Amino acid sequence: MQPSGGHTGELSPDAVLTGIDAVLWEEYTREQQPQYLRATDDFFFKQGETEGIGFIWDEDSNVGAFEATSEQEELVNTDTWIGNQTTKQSQKWIKQVPISDEAFKADMVGKRAKIGEQVGDRARLTQDKEAIQRTYADAFSGSIHTTPDGQALASNSHVALKGQTVDNLETGSLTADNLWTNVTSLANQYAQDGEAGSHVFEGLLVPFTLYKTAKETMNSQLAPFGAENQINIFDTDYGTVRIYASIFLGSTFSNETNAATSYHLISRSHQICRKVFYGLTTALIPPENTANDSYLLRSKFHETTFPGTWTGYLGSNGTT
């Protein structure tokens, strides 16, 4: 099919004819929002590459705790295995903008160069939005991805490889007391062998509307939102927690239930992943290679994001 539309003199006559003083380009400071989460962040997303368009992995059972043994007692062997093999396919994302030969050569206002800037910005926006909405935002419904045991990332019905039920779903709104309940739950979380995972709270991700509450809860010297003078343990003992926010978690850009109240705790051992088949590439195809004498600006990237397993993660929907 021959390219049509895009940037042409017919669609944007002011760009190829004299007579206007300026174009009021949109400018974005999205990435300058405080603690803005990028898809390329290597703490909230475990980064990696794929050799093909799919990524295949198993969960590991670990080896369990040591056994008490008497002198010359026959030793007990321990089974250890991998299981729940899962595959995720990488996704191609593409933007193609035709530019007529006339519009390319007669650009009076810099529209041609601006298209390149806009494509780059929208590539980053797409990466960030899709990475967050396909993992953290999807954590409670599992409508896009589930963990290898078939549950949503945040669930009270996870099953460890050795059979224990694991609950990493909480419901408390973002308050100091509820946050401590969540931190305790993360510390008490089972490992795959049914022993202590005991993950340390090191990252907090919230919709942008909860960012103020998160900062006041975490960084106040005294316990927040009360008259007591007890120390705020989150400021003293958890002072290095990464607090990040995203507009793509909130109800403006997410259709998930409880989008405005949900939040996420992670440890460094979480397995929320971003795997890249290839990064952003851009090609300008000349008009002699198209059917209607137009340039083609074609940009694309190929990647996927998904929760590899439930370990080291806890989600609260903030409903109580």
Spans of model-derived segments:
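Residues in well-ordered beta-strands of folded domains
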Residues: 54-59, 98, 205, 266-267, ...
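N-terminal alpha-helical "arm" segments
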Residues: 1-32
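Active-site acid/base region of carbohydrate-active enzymes
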Residues: 55-57, 62-65, 139-157
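Sequence/fold signature of self-assembling virion shell proteins
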Residues: 2-8, 150-188, 200-203, 210-320
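Surface-exposed acidic, glycine-flexible loop patches that form ligand/cofactor-binding
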Residues: 191-197
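Long, contiguous amphipathic alpha-helices that act as assembly "spine/axial" helices in icosahedral shell
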Residues: 84-143, 204, 295-299
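Assembly/oligomerization interface modules of large self-assembling protein complexes
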Residues: 25-93
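Sec/Tat-exported extracytoplasmic proteins
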Residues: 123, 127-130, 190, 208, ...
